[in-house]
Amino acid sequence: MSGDGATEQAAEYVPEKVKKAEKKLEENPYDLDAWSILIREAQNQPIDKARKTYERLVAQFPSSGRFWKLYIEAEIKAKNYDKVEKLFQRCLMKVLHIDLWKCYLSYVRETKGKLPSYKEKMAQAYDFALDKIGMEIMSYQIWVDYINFLKGVEAVGSYAENQRITAVRRVYQRGCVNPMINIEQLWRDYNKYEEGINIHLAKKMIEDRSRDYMNARRVAKEYETVMKGLDRNAPSVPPQNTPQEAQQVDMWKKYIQWEKSNPLRTEDQTLITKRVMFAYEQCLLVLGHHPDIWYEAAQYLEQSSKLLAEKGDMNNAKLFSDEAANIYERAISTLLKKNMLLYFAYADYEESRMKYEKVHSIYNRLLAIEDIDPTLVYIQYMKFARRAEGIKSGRMIFKKAREDTRTRHHVYVTAALMEYYCSKDKSVAFKIFELGLKKYGDIPEYVLAYIDYLSHLNEDNNTRVLFERVLTSGSLPPEKSGEIWARFLAFESNIGDLASILKVEKRRFTAFKEEYEGKETALLVDRYKFMDLYPCSASELKALGYKDVSRAKLAAIIPDPVVAPSIVPVLKDEVDRKPEYPKPDTQQMIPFQPRHLAPPGLHPVPGGVFPVPPAAVVLMKLLPPPICFQGPFVQVDELMEIFRRCKIPNTVEEAVRIITGGAPELAVEGNGPVESNAVLTKAVKRPNEDSDEDEEKGAVVPPVHDIYRARQQKRIR
């Protein structure tokens, strides 16, 4: 029993690093470092135990070919071929990753070799792969493998032999006009193949394809350049807004734009569209969480569909039109299930195709997601229903929105304005606003929308009554009423007399007495300001403690802004705002003006030199200024090396003998004494003297203790 318990404990043991990784993934499911730890752990476990981790991995990163390949290879290693084929069915069509497709071909080649129909299945697999991934810049090996496979197929009889030659030639000719790395080698192999079949026909066959090959080779060079630097194995994660990510996004868009520019210079719009969409598919493997890529891909398909329809190619036009809808469907079904932007674009696209039932299903599908705010969805849904089916259909959607407890006040505003502008019925709009006021009377944004509507109708009495109702009913908290009071004052300033203006100002001051105590002048600004014109300068407004509640509301980028009283002024100049982080004093910066050919010992850029030690400063003051010295400049390193090697005499007598030539005792480390006469003679020689001629005529033999030669010999050793 104890042994069984120990076995269970061992089976349940989880390494500490795995626990930490799991904790990180709870906080951020896209933490790649944590996933790397789990992947390494799974690779060291039996597949039955690791399968759960792999399933989580591909569920989190469904577009990552690298992760799918890891999962499939683990199943292949365990010989679970039935599971392998199911995995390929799940990912192969959706993930156009070159390594994943090579893994698929390798799997078919290794596991189907003993079947009677192996040759047919393998040929179908290669054709399928080239159709899907043949435009890949790294697809050369697949083309070569297919050709070698066809060459190796046994052909009995002349008919079968001709069939094989035709099949090989067809693949060669397709590959030689497809831009990719190593296209030159494929072309050379094709030339040899044709010459091996019939040298007389080969020349014409090659000439017929030569122009297209040269064009493809040129494009392949550009293709390789534009793809350089792209991280194509990166898993797709939500936008991180990092410089590295921005750089990758920019590079991907340049690649797509390059494909759109038609580098092959072909007139086949279908081929252009297929190449551009292949670029989009490659991009979406890495940037699948970026809605703009999905939208641009669908837009491009829609444009291509219209272009083909104009040319009369209705079949491909319909194909691309349906594929555009499929792009939207894939986006909202996989990585961007809650992205309203793509749902709305998808709905508009189907509306343009007059498929109204499909549009209804799209909106209802989004509304069925429980953990979203459906307000904007209902608003767009109402607008669609009114456009496509009339005002009555829009009212039905509004009724449905009122019954949904998740909706907010914006739905009432939209419905009221829709009634006013579309049915021209002010009374219906007024009733909707009144109905909403009962429910959202404590939300200043809704009250302001109602006020704007009444102001638009120029109904002064009703507007004034609304102001009084809202401000005196007690439904609106005082801390939220700041903008309502400001709008009331602006309203009276536009249409009321001075007495009514002063009355509103007094009531407003009473409502915010604690805030504006001692700052009565700040309230005076609101009486005279108009739009962005103020009766004081920005610094004066700041000194008054003035705050503009309308600007404060616009500046607050939050879903439900709350305008709370504050003694801190909101209106500030950019100059008055202090940075939130320390900044250098740019006035003290030295312009970057590097010296041209700076002499040794000086910095190429002025400034940045360390202060001179005090003792050296005293010495420098005693020396003549630098302008007095015109050269020659001493090589300091060599001079210091000579000083280091010199042996200084210990006594005065020894020094005198060396100077007077009494004894040649000037020595260098390990080199013995030096001939002093030669040194002195060389030292006193006149500069104008023709030393080269004298040395050639007389001093043929070098000195016995030549320092220079001794040093050179020492270096050689």
UniProtKB/Swiss-Prot annotation:
GO terms for molecular function: mRNA binding; RNA binding. Residues 684-705 are annotated as: Disordered. It holds the Pfam family Suf. GO terms for biological process: co-transcriptional mRNA 3'-end processing, cleavage and polyadenylation pathway; RNA 3'-end processing. Its main location: nucleus. The modification Phosphoserine is found at S691. GO terms for cellular component: mRNA cleavage stimulating factor complex; nucleoplasm; nucleus. HAT repeats lie at residues 45-77, 79-110, 117-152, 163-196, 221-261, 271-303, 319-352, 354-387, 458-494. SMART domains: HAT. Keywords: Acetylation, mRNA processing, Nucleus, Phosphoprotein, Repeat. Homodimer. The CSTF complex is composed of CSTF1 (50 kDa subunit), CSTF2 (64 kDa subunit) and CSTF3 (77 kDa subunit). CSTF3 directly interacts with CSTF1 and CSTF2. Interacts with FIP1L1. One of the multiple factors required for polyadenylation and 3'-end cleavage of mammalian pre-mRNAs. This is Cleavage stimulation factor subunit 3. It comes from Homo sapiens (Human).
